[in-house]
Curated annotation (Swiss-Prot):
Protein name in UniProt: Maturase K
InterPro entries: Domain_X, Maturase_MatK, Maturase_MatK_N
Annotated function: Usually encoded in the trnK tRNA gene intron. Probably assists in splicing its own and other chloroplast group II introns.
Top-level taxon of the source organism: Eukaryota
Any single GO BP term: RNA splicing
Pfam short name (any one): Intron_maturas2
Family in the record: Belongs to the intron maturase 2 family. MatK subfamily.
Cross-referenced PANTHER family: MATURASE K
Source species taxonomy: Eukaryota, Viridiplantae, Streptophyta, Embryophyta, Tracheophyta
Taxonomic source organism: Impatiens capensis
Amino acid sequence: MEEFKGYLELDRSQQQDFLYSLSFQESIYTLAHDHGLNRLILNADSDKKYSLLIVKCLITQMYQQNLLIFSANEPKQNLFFGHNTDLYCRILFEAFTVILEIPFSLRERPFIERKEMVQFLNLRSIHSIFPFLEDKFSHSNYVVDILLPHSIHLEILVQTLRYWVKDASSLHLLRFFLHQYHNWNSFIIPKQSRFFFXKKKKBQRLFFFLYNSKVCEYESIFIFLRNQSVHLRSISSEAFLERIYFYEKMEYFLEVYAKDFQAFFWLFKDLFMHYVRYQGKCILVSKGTSFLMSKWKYYLVNLWQSCFYMWSQPGRVQINQFSNYSLDFLGYLSSVRRNPSMTWSQMLENSFLISLVIKKFDTRVPTIPLIRSLSKAKFSNILGYPISKASWADFSDSNIIDRFGRIYRNLSHYHSGSPKKTSLYKVKYILRLSCVRTLARKHKSKVRSFLKRFGSGLLEEFFMEEEQVLTLNLQKISFTLRRFYGRQIWYLDIFCINDLAKSE
């Protein structure tokens, strides 16, 4: 938040078109460069250096009747005043994202102060969700595994912002730019379609922001209906609804949906349900019956298609009994393990045997997805056989070893919450041998000759076990406390899961 304050020094006359005026401030593009374009500009050719004047001319050109249409098949013609149009589109994309995120960031702080909520930075961690899962999932019966719909027209995404952003000029500029960017056959939106969420990963920050705004709109209504159906109101849900600023929507659904769905509310009385979403996937967990979960599945699919114009196949919503199902979520295979036990109980002179079943939330590290990621990043083939990283062969020896070691430490750090680390040992073997093959490739020697020359202990300090790192950092913790917690420790400093291919 403090970073944005220096870029918001506007006159009162500019307050009406607050966001639109920011589109022509050089400081915004400097901030956009600092956030996402550093690597792009540093690796750019000499003719790709940008200037604010070219950006302003490009914005002005979009409003002209003679709009420029560029061909992706002829990249040499994709020039605007002698500069590469693709570069300026990326700059505009990043700047639009920064500008649209400003009102959301400004609104979040007053909300927290008004609710007197204590700010814990650890709550930002992805791992902060797992203690909640451990506490709630062991008492649940059914889990609904949901893949969110992803085919959304760009116009629908822009219209979603109208409930938050009251600046019509900035919305018109955003709409102009998105349609023009489609005409330029961008690397984000396929030429054959204007529907969002292609699987290419370049410059998707703005589209992720728009898509999450649309999903939050659906979630606000879903949580509202869920709160109407239970006696115990969720404080966090109410805070979430107020935070995303859907007052107009809420008033509408209070009048319409509360009447239309009154006949269905009796089905869900006293139903304890937990909702978690990450990226394009969400899960519903409940203590209810299979019949009730089927009702929720029917409701969700119809809500998406009728109210939000998001087509979803019923097969994307799967209902499973938690005792016989492993949930693939956030890089873990999670399940509820049943541990039976027997105990003797005595009442007066009679003693009898009691059978107990203890449910425990269990997490396992999946092997196949990890090997698939290593294969995608060219550390191994699809079968997990290590290969050399050809693109790193020109780096120094210490740099190569450090890169491989950092990847393994990050993976070990993230998956430290699982007591079963067999998959990590396989990953460690693949990365170590891939590192050796890369070094041997650089020195133009065979792997066996390289190991005889430098020794196998060369890589040990870079592939230190996560448990050893933890012991070095927490030497003052007593042995009893470490034994009590075992090896399952959730690190609350992990904000994202980085793709291995981006480690370069």
